[in-house]
Each structure stands twice: as structure tokens, then as C-alpha cells.
């Protein structure tokens, strides 16, 4: 096997915009990494998800096109 073909594996500090700091190891080649979201502030992980009500859109679509039917004969 060849020696020295693997990248250096070093400590990486990932800092989120919410202030959460995560220390991990990586072969990225940087000492710091800045994140927009992490598990501490992402809505999926915090349970603060917003459900979009698409039922109103579907009803509006059906109402708009309910008059059209396949009654056109050729």
C-alpha cells in the first residue's frame, strides 16, 4: 500500500448563526466552518415547524375548474 495518500484528519469547529458551536473531526482542510442552520435551530429538530394549509388552494382550484368537463364531443 502507498503511504501518505490520505488527507490529514484534524479537528474542525463548526459555528452556527444561532451561536451553537460543534466540535468534530474532518478532512476538509479548514479549522472553522460557519453554518446557517444546525440541529439546535432548524425547525424540524426543534419541533417548531409550520404546516402550510394547501387545502384552501385545492378547493379554490376545484371550484374554478368545476364547470369544465369532458363533455366536448368530436
Swiss-Prot record:
GO terms for molecular function: metal ion binding; rRNA binding; structural constituent of ribosome. Keywords: Metal-binding, Ribonucleoprotein, Ribosomal protein, RNA-binding, rRNA-binding, Zinc. One of its GO terms (biological process) is translation. It comes from the Bacteria. Zn(2+) binds at residues 16, 18, 38, 41. Binds 1 zinc ion per subunit. One of its GO terms (cellular component) is ribosome. Its cofactor is Zn(2+). Part of the 50S ribosomal subunit. Binds the 23S rRNA. Belongs to the bacterial ribosomal protein bL31 family. Type A subfamily. NCBIfam families: L31, PRK00019.1, PRK00528.1. HAMAP family: Ribosomal_bL31_1. This is Large ribosomal subunit protein bL31. It comes from Acinetobacter baylyi (strain ATCC 33305 / BD413 / ADP1).
Amino acid at each position: 500500500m502507498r503511504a501518505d495518500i490520505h488527507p490529514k484528519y484534524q479537528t474542525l469547529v463548526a459555528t452556527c448563526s444561532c451561536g451553537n458551536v460543534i466540535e468534530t473531526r474532518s478532512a476538509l482542510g479548514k479549522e472553522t466552518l460557519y453554518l446557517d442552520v444546525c440541529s439546535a435551530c432548524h425547525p424540524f429538530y426543534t419541533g417548531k415547524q409550520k404546516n402550510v394549509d394547501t387545502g384552501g388552494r385545492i378547493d379554490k382550484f376545484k371550484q374554478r375548474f368545476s364547470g369544465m368537463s369532458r363533455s366536448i364531443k368530436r
